[in-house]
């Protein structure tokens, strides 16, 4: 449709006196010239360029006689202008060219420029002509002239004495008498008796009138406010032959404008609304079609303060109407009442500082060529508001403004390829939506489709230039792809009249005054006619369309005076030699393409179907056209100009199931004709004998005749249908989509029986469903259930002009207008309409076919929300509520629980009871979420329960959710649940918490330990670091002053309740040997792990089975079991050849079976200083830097492996850089030694095997921290298990030191001893890789055994089972409460002990380099 663009322009015509101020503008029939009236002046302006050509100035003496000029009317051939004056005179001016071939303005080109050579009519078209104005005739009608209208070769004039004068353009009445309106009979319709009521008042006269050619009559407004339509009942224009009809409910008419294409009469009223009437074809009565009025909802401040409607003007293509009011303002509407623009609100009405502007007052306006410009005579400021004195400047004086518009190509060229793309055309540029529709909506579909496409057909936005990653391409941003029309073509062919885009959105064709040109988005180039004479000899009359690589256009050949249908190939030169030309008997008005058929509508009201076929003749590719069928529509179409669009479709009243052959469902089943807003369908007559199609060629077969037309809908502006087929989405692809202006949209939907059962004969097979949308539709994405459109947006720049003198600038008075893309989902409207009509089965089939759309959950939510809002807020009881039906419908989908709770969260609390009465008890829905493991949705239901139930119920359900979240490791949710439980206990549960984010927490894999990291859950949540706990939506919790009101008793009780749940979970994790989960749990929730382990040292924190624990840790931390290298028997490390290298390479392992005791002692000393304590200092940062991929480069040593099937082939030499914990100094040693030593294959193999026996670097960091934690807590048996995995002999040495220096529990030492013995037995039988390390620590084990025998009596060597008492009865929960209630959360400062965060960059690569356990376990650590 029409959209404002940029700022308006002001033409330079500053009046020197009030007599020179412009007051009226009127365009000629071709809209190339504009007559501008001042009180004593007549000026002629040219449209492009917008320049003044000639001015006639009335002498003072005659000006006093005639009075000031009032109105102007052009003769149809633009050779004369009639001007009415205030004293009842009509002045006839002749327009003549001055002195032959002279031009007022000529473009100057350099010599030899191609523009000067051989362009026919170049000067006429491209130069402003020099004209003369000469007054030829003066006619005195002796009464003030109210209106004058050009009717064919006559001028119809209405005067204030109630007379109608029919005057010839030469200024003569030809003896015809004036008609007295009081003698014209009026009635409500033409079927009433011939003698109707008369006006009957002597002072009644016509105030405004306009002739309607397609209705053959005049729409009139009388001075008493009544409106009517006067039509001659025969060809003679006399009082006896005129009859009038009027609507009885309009008494405040002010002005009128007529739409010839849609046969509409728009009457402006004093109330500020516009009433649009049409004529009933059968009775002749005036029927109200629709109203154009501002609503209080959209414009609460101004809707009833606009004053009377002052002017109404229909656009040149009759698809839009512009309205202005007495107190100022401008509004633009589509033909059937969809509002497009209004300047009484938003940035048009308010400055950036919030102050109100005076609305623009308009005295006169007229549309320019093709509707690209609106010429406006602006008046003085608003009359009913105080005018600021400093604004009395030139802008407040009457001036000529040019508003610029861009419009949809559907207004003039509604061919099918234009219906699936949004294409707007401006005066010199085109706007199209980026990307292919199907590709942008469905990336998977688009990629598959792109693979099937030939290379030359792929969209430029799919590969190469611009990318279409998904929905964002078509919907996610507001920008257009702007194509500048070739200036060479525009120079001689302005204005652009038609545009068309192909189905893939790659090629665009435009047609102006002569010829046409096309543009490729792939090559970014225009292609024009090489022979300019061929271009200038062709006028495109009926539009143009794309068929594959061909342009199909209907044109008039000027040289042969012949109507033609031409087809040009895109890839060949633009020349008539490569065109296929078919002569046509009559002028073609409309053209469209359906599959391999072309349908044209001609001026004789006939429709002709052509078949089009590609033909290859050697290197030349052409297309041939054959006539298939002609259909005469003259019986049904009163005037050919009334046809808005003609379309071939496969749509019929019977859906594809009931047709006799499947081919018929894809054929051109019917013709859709938009006749002045009435959608008429003619489908093929299949009642008679069918034609066999087996043997006949499809282009030569005889086609079935068409049935008589059937009216499908009224007030139709645009029609969308597709020729594609998709079995999964038949409802959407076989439907017919209609745009009905202010009434919204309609869809003619097919109804299919379930499972292809035979349909019932008494059931309709299609249904028309109306629905409202908030945008003006320009394209329908059938498979994606989306409507695309465009909307005007505004940008204020008045803040840039601060000087008072600059406040008169147009940039200050008007905002800058831009056009933005927009879209809307319509699926929920259709589903609702089907449910209203008890067609739930059809609604379910339709919804299931669209369930894969990414916004389908939003569709269900929208439907539920709209029905809930309407029914729950209704003032009157609803006899048959729809909400239960909608609720039952949504339960058919797995998204039911999310849909309900999201709808509730976006709805007022007062409506919840009504909602849950229909969908079910929120407690039951919460439990369903828990059963389905949908914890985020359950958390949302918890907020509902908090507001609808007592705190005890909320606590019960919150506890269930908390325990489940703990088990699943949803740490963000756990944190929110802790706060939520505290809020309930604090008595502040009235505050409705908000939903946690539904996304997966990013920190679910890792844990962060700090040196003093224990966090007391007894503290308030204000201390929680915002970076760690802050989310977009959080469960609410009292903060600030309200937190101080908590009683200490309730705080202690709540904290105890929460701590008991945390202790229980930690105990379960430890008993199930889930150390990694325990570490994540403690780090994420700030659990006091060390203090808790101290209490559980001899109970839950005791290792019962060392072998099982060892296996589980290997599995959880992706740590490979140790292996014995194949070449270990002849290892180079037995001699001292590689002693330096060996020392450095084995620092991190210190457990090689061939290391001497002296080496072992040295290495253990290094390890003791670099184990966990160094990991949290600067040294470990260096380790990270060395072992993580960084800017510094390190060598990777590769060696061929001797036995590919052997277990040792798992190791990779690249593990050296990914998994090793060698520090920077060690790398220097390695590089130096390896550069000087020549290692054999067996030596490299040995190093590789050693590296292969280590796990990921991150796992190593985590295990060392856990080792540190257990050591601090005194859980020495767990220390031994972790030390075994890391093969740290220093752990056993430390254990010995502790056992010797302090009194240790004998049971623990005995447990360690028996556990190590069990590991030794397991290693002997199942894992010999552990044997070398066990041999290394054998002396320490022997010493440990001696200490054990000293501490423990012989009778205590029996197996001991430690009882695990439940925490409910254990005094442990209370005995150390004081120690658990202090501490603070450590902020993650730059210098703090947060190591894991520094290691994050290594995560991916370290894990990828562990092929042993690849894909077996999840090791995502944040």
From Swiss-Prot:
Q: Which residues carry this modification: Phosphothreonine?
A: 991, 995
Q: Which residues carry this modification: Phosphoserine?
A: 1014, 1016, 1018, 1036, 1171
Tissue pattern of expression reads: Expressed in the eye lens.
Entry's localization field: Cytoplasm, Cytosol; Membrane
Q: What are the annotated GO cellular component locations? A: cytosol; membrane; protein-containing complex; Ric1-Rgp1 guanyl-nucleotide exchange factor complex
Q: Which InterPro entries match?
A: Quino_amine_DH_bsu, Ric1, RIC1_C, WD40/YVTN_repeat-like_dom_sf
Disordered: annotated span? 442-462, 986-1005, 1021-1048, 1179-1198, 1355-1422
Principal cellular location given in the protein's record? cytoplasm
Q: What are the alphabetically sorted keywords of the record?
A: Cytoplasm, Guanine-nucleotide releasing factor, Membrane, Phosphoprotein, Repeat, WD repeat
Q: Where are the WD repeats?
A: 64-103, 304-343
Q: Which GO terms describe its molecular function?
A: guanyl-nucleotide exchange factor activity; small GTPase binding
Q: Name one Pfam family in it.
A: Beta-prop_RIC1_2nd
A GO term (biological process) for this protein?
A: positive regulation of GTPase activity
The biased composition feature labelled Acidic residues covers 1403-1412
Sequence ranges of Polar residues compositional bias: 1378-1396
Compositional bias ranges of the Basic and acidic residues kind: 449-460
What the record says about family reads: Belongs to the RIC1 family.
Q: What does this protein do?
A: The RIC1-RGP1 complex acts as a guanine nucleotide exchange factor (GEF), which activates RAB6A by exchanging bound GDP for free GTP, and may thereby be required for efficient fusion of endosome-derived vesicles with the Golgi compartment. The RIC1-RGP1 complex participates in the recycling of mannose-6-phosphate receptors. Required for phosphorylation and localization of GJA1. Is a regulator of procollagen transport and secretion, and is required for correct cartilage morphogenesis and development of the craniofacial skeleton.
Q: What quaternary structure, including any partners, is listed in this protein's UniProt entry?
A: Forms a complex with RGP1; the interaction enhances RAB6A GTPase activity. Interacts (via central domain) with RGP1. Interacts with RAB6A; the interaction is direct with a preference for RAB6A-GDP. Interacts (via C-terminus domain) with RAB33B; the interaction is direct with a preference for RAB33B-GTP. Interacts with GJA1.
Task: List the protein's name.
Answer: Guanine nucleotide exchange factor subunit RIC1
């Amino acid at each position: 449709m029409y959209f404002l663009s940029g700022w308006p322009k002001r033409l330079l015509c500053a009046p020197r006196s009030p007599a020179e101020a412009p007051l009226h503008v009127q365009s000629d029939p071709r809209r190339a010239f504009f007559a501008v009236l001042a009180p004593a002046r007549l000026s002629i302006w040219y449209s492009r360029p917008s320049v003044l050509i000639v001015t006639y100035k009335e002498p003072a003496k005659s000006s006093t006689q005639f009075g000031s000029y009032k109105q102007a009317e052009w003769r149809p051939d633009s050779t004369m202008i009639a001007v009415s004056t205030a004293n009842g005179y009509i002045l006839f001016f002749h327009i003549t060219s001055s002195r032959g071939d002279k031009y007022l303005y000529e473009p100057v080109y350099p010599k030899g420029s191609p523009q000067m050579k051989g362009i026919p009519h170049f000067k006429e078209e491209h130069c402003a002509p020099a004209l003369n104005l000469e007054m030829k005739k003066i006619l005195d009608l002796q009464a003030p002239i109210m209106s004058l209208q050009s009717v064919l070769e006559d001028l119809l004039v209405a005067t204030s004495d109630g007379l109608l004068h029919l005057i010839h353009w030469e200024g003569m009445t030809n003896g015809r008498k004036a008609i007295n309106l009081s003698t014209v009979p009026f009635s409500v319709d033409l079927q009433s008796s011939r003698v109707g009521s008369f006006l009957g008042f002597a002072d009644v006269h016509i105030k405004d009138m306009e002739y309607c050619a397609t209705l053959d009559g005049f729409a009139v407004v009388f001075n008493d406010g009544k409106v009517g339509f006067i039509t001659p009942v025969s060809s003679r224009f006399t009082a006896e032959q005129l009859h009038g009809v009027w609507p009885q409910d309009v008494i405040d008419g002010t002005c009128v404008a007529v739409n010839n294409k849609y046969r509409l009469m728009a009457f402006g009223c004093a109330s500020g609304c516009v009433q649009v009437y049409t004529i009933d074809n059968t009775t002749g009565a005036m029927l109200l079609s629709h109203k154009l009025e501002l609503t209080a909802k959209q414009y609460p401040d101004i809707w009833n303060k606009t004053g009377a409607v002052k002017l109404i003007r229909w656009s040149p293509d009759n698809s839009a109407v512009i309205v202005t009011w007495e107190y100022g303002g401008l509004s633009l509407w589509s033909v059937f009442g969809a509002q497009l623009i209004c300047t009484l609100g938003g940035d048009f009405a308010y400055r950036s500082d919030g102050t109100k502007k005076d609305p623009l007052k308009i005295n006169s306006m007229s549309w320019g060529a093709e509707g690209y410009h609106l010429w406006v005579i602006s008046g003085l400021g608003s009359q009913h508001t105080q005018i600021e004195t400093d604004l009395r400047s030139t802008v407040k004086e009457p001036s000529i403004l040019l508003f610029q518009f861009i419009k949809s190509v559907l207004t003039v060229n509604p061919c099918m390829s234009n219906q699936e793309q949004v294409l707007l055309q401006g005066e010199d540029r085109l706007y199209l939506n980026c990307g292919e529709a199907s590709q942008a909506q469905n990336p998977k579909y688009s990629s598959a489709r792109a693979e099937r496409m030939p290379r030359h057909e792929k969209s430029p936005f799919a590969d190469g230039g611009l990318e279409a990653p998904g929905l964002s391409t078509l919907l996610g941003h507001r920008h257009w792809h702007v194509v500048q029309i070739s200036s060479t073509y525009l120079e001689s062919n302005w204005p652009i009249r038609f545009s068309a885009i192909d189905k893939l959105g790659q090629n665009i064709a435009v047609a102006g005054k002569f010829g046409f040109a096309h543009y490729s988005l792939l090559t970014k180039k225009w292609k024009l006619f090489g022979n300019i004479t061929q271009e200038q000899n062709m006028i495109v009359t009926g539009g143009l369309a794309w068929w594959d690589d061909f342009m199909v256009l209907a044109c008039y050949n000027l040289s042969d005076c012949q109507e033609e249908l031409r087809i040009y190939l895109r890839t060949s030169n633009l020349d008539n030699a490569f065109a296929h030309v078919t002569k046509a008997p009559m002028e073609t008005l409309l053209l469209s393409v359906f599959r391999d058929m072309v349908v044209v509508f001609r001026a004789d009201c006939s429709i002709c179907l052509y078949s089009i076929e590609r033909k290859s003749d050697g290197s030349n590719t052409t297309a041939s056209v054959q006539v298939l069928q002609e259909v005469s529509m003259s019986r049904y179409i009163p005037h050919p100009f009334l046809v808005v669009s003609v379309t071939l479709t496969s749509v019929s009243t019977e859906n594809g199931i009931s047709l006799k052959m499947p081919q018929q469902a894809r054929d051109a089943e019917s013709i859709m004709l938009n006749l002045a807003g009435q959608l008429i369908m003619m489908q093929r007559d299949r009642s008679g004998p069918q034609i066999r199609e087996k043997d006949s060629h499809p282009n030569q077969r005889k086609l079935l005749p068409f049935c008589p037309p059937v009216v499908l809908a009224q007030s139709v502006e645009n029609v969308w249908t597709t020729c594609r087929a998709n079995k999964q989405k038949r409802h959407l692809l076989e439907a017919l989509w209609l745009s009905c202006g202010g009434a919204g949209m309609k869809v003619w939907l097919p109804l299919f029986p379930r499972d292809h059962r035979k349909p019932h004969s008494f059931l309709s097979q299609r249904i028309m469903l109306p629905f409202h949308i908030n945008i003006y539709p320009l394209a329908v994405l059938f498979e994606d259930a989306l409507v695309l459109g465009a909307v005007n947006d505004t940008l204020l720049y008045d803040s840039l002009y601060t000087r008072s003198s600059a406040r008169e600038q147009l940039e200050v008075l008007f905002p800058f207008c831009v056009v933005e893309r927009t879209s809307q989902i319509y699926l929920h409207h259709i589903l609702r309409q089907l449910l209203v009509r008890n067609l739930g089965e059809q609604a379910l089939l339709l919804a299931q076919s669209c369930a894969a759309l990414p916004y389908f959950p939003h569709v269900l939510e929208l439907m539920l929300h709209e029905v809930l809002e309407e029914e729950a807020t209704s003032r009157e009881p609803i006899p048959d509520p729809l909400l239960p039906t909608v609720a039952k419908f949504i339960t058919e989908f797995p998204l039911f629980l999310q849909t309900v709770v999201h709808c509730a969260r976006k709805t007022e609390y007062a409506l919840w009871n009504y909602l849950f009465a229909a969908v079910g008890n929120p407690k039951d829905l919460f439990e369903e979420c828990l059963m389905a493991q949908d914890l985020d949705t359950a958390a949302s239901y918890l907020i509902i329960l908090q507001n609808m139930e007592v705190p005890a119920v909320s606590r019960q359900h919150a506890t269930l959710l908390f325990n489940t979240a703990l088990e699943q490791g949803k740490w963000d949710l756990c944190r929110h649940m802790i706060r939520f439980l505290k809020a309930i206990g604090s008595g502040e549960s009235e505050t409705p918490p908000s939903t946690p984010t539904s996304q997966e927490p990013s920190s679910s894999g890792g844990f962060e330990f700090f040196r003093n990291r224990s966090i007391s859950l007894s503290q308030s949540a204000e201390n929680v670091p915002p970076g760690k706990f802050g989310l977009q939506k959080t469960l609410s919790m009292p903060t600030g002053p309200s937190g101080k009101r908590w009683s200490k008793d309730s705080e202690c009780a709540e904290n105890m309740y929460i701590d008991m749940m945390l202790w229980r979970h930690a105990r379960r994790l430890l008993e199930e040997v889930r150390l990694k989960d325990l570490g994540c749990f403690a780090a994420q929730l700030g659990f006091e792990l060390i203090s808790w382990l101290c209490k559980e040292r001899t109970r839950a924190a005791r290792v019962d089975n060392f072998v099982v624990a060892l296996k589980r840790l290997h599995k959880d931390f992706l740590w490979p079991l140790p292996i014995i290298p194949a070449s270990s028997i002849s290892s180079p490390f037995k001699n001292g050849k590689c002693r330096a290298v060996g020392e450095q390479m084995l620092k991190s392992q210190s457990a090689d079976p061939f290391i001497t005791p002296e080496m072992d002692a040295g290495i253990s000393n290094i390890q003791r200083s670099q184990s966990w304590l160094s990991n949290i200092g600067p040294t470990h940062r260096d380790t990270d830097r060395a072992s993580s991929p960084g800017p510094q480069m390190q060598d990777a040593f590769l060696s061929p492996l001797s036995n590919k099937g052997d277990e040792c082939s798992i190791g990779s030499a690249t593990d050296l850089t990914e998994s090793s914990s060698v520090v920077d100094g060690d790398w220097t040693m390695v590089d130096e030694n390896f550069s000087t030593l020549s290692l054999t294959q067996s030596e490299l193999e040995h190093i590789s095997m050693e590296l292969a026996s280590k796990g990921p670097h991150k796992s190593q960091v985590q295990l060392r921290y856990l080792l540190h934690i257990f050591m601090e807590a005194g859980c020495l048996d767990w220390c031994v298990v972790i030390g075994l995995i890391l093969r740290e002999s220093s752990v056993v040495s430390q254990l010995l030191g502790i056992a010797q220096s302090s009194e240790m529990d004998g049971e623990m030492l005995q447990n360690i001893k028996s556990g190590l013995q069990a590991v030794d037995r397991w290693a002997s039988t199942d894992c010999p890789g552990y044997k070398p390390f066990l041999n290394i620590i054998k002396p320490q084990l022997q010493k440990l055994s001696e200490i054990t025998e000293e501490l423990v009596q012989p009778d205590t060597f029996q197996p001991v089972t430690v009882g695990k008492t439940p925490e409910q009865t254990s005094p442990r929960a209370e005995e150390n409460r004081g120690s658990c209630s202090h501490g603070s959360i450590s902020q993650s400062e730059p210098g703090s002990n947060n190591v894991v965060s520094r290691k994050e960059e290594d995560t991916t690569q370290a894990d990828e380099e562990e092929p042993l356990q690849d894909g077996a376990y999840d090791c995502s650590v944040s």
